[in-house]
Amino acid sequence: MRRASLIVFLSVIAAFASRPPVIATAAPEVTFTRDVAPILHARCVVCHRPGEVAPMALLTYQDARPWARAIKDKVVARQMPPWFADPAVGAFANDPRLSAEDIATISRWVDAGAPQGDPKDMPTPPRFTEGWQLGEPDMVVELPEVRIPATGTDYFPTPSLTLDLKEDRWIRAIEIRPSNRAITHHSVIFSANVSAMSAMSSTGMFDVLGVWAVGTPPTVYPEGTGRWVHKGQMLRTNLHYHPNGTPQVDRTRVGLYFGKGEMKKEVAAALAGNVTFSIPPNAPNFELRSVYMVDQDINIVSFFPHMHLRGKDMKMTATFPDGRQQTLLNVPAYDFNWQLFYYPKTKVPLPRGTRVDLVAHYDNSAANKNNPDPSRAIMFGEASSTSEMMFGMFEFTADAGVSPKPSTERERMEALVASLPADSSFLIDLPFGPSGLPAVLHLPRTGEGAFYTQVLGVILPQPVAKLQWEGNTFQFNTLLRILNPAAGYYTVTGTIGDDGTVRGKLQRLGNNARPQPSFEYSGAHKPKG
């Protein structure tokens, strides 16, 4: 037995000894021409080329070599290419992120001393369209010339003009071209003959027509879809410039590309947002909320989150009529310097009755390196990037018909109360404004409640503090943020009747030495269905 075992053992040793030795082979050297240039050409040079917004070109080895270490640092940290959507939420057609393999290739190239490689391996640089990226437009609109002062705070002119159209047309694409990109932060074009927020208030839709910002390509709508521009249409603008020490001039042009035949679906825009907030000084994580109610079956085709320098993160979540929830967009590390649209690879369907909650956080502390003054309370404002904004815009098409149907303030609040528990939610009328202000009370016997009002078309949940119940009578305190002199702190009382109606009073809080106004309100349950 031992002899047999020994024979087997010796046979195994002999077999291994007779094999040729295994020689380790080194990984092939990573070179710029063969390995790195294709990555940069595919993902980076749309901005990193002469005449564009990036501070350096990366088209050639001579361009890239001085920046090799910085390139590695930026791509390893995933700061370049710029992209801020949570990769675990959704899939987007314009996601420019590098793969892990591409990042490893760039890292190996830099660590090896950034060798050039064989010039014969160098790919042909991509060809870019000079001038209009989408080709010659069907109509070019020139905005009035803007003169930007050499110094001072950021400059926000708002020129407007009327389109010279002989008939209504629909556009399949729009391209915005500032003439002086070195100082231009963004150019936003609105199609409303009134302010965009006034249009949002009256229709529930936000009439933004196009946006130019660093990293934002021209807008091309899905096949057969587009936006209307009308005879006599006024284009309003919001332009943003950075003074750079010398007087500058910009003349922005807008290229319109008309669709052919009948438009199958009109693309509309809407948003959740907040326009009445105040962020306290030195607040490191101040939260703002807003709600949008979907009042028809729609499909989302793009998202556009917007805040300013103190913006920290933003999340958009849908609660469907059956109670299911889905995160639509999550931007965990917002960067004001990059105003990006996010285009889903497939349309995102939202049925009628879906509630979209927008939650954003702001860092008004000294720890925020972009914060110009943490000692100030910060209000909503469009006229400066040192103020703040909170908008989660999205573009969509409606399932029914060609164009989405507009909605009134009351219809939007009716949709909201129908989405809440019927036994603890009431649609009420506040005695503010020429025709009253519809609002919603959500007052559960346990847990957190909310007082929903609407300002310029956006629904704002106001906190409910010290909610107390005694039988069918309740009382709570709230800060009523509305665009009305009656805005302020209130104690709200009310009684629920056996028939589901509610009546009560808002008592203004203030100096006890002076009488404060009070307002009566009434309303009722709005059961689902």
Annotate each predicted stretch with a short phrase.
Residues 5-19:
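Bacterial N-terminal signal peptides
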Residues 55, 171, 184-186, 251-253, ...:
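Exposed beta-strand and adjacent loop surfaces of beta-rich binding modules
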Residues 16-166, 173, 177, 232-238, ...:
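Aromatic- and Gly/Pro-enriched helix-to-coil junctions and flexible linker segments
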Residues 134-401, 458-459:
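His-enriched metal-coordination microenvironments in redox/metal-binding proteins
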Residues 393-428, 528:
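Extracellular/periplasmic ectodomains of large secreted or surface enzymes and adhesion receptors
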Residues 417-497, 503-529:
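Central antiparallel beta-sheet cores of small beta-barrel/beta-sandwich binding domains
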Residues 101, 228-232, 320-324, 349-355, ...:
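A short, structured loop/turn motif at beta-sheet edges
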Residues 1-2:
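N-terminal secretory signal peptides that target proteins for export/translocation
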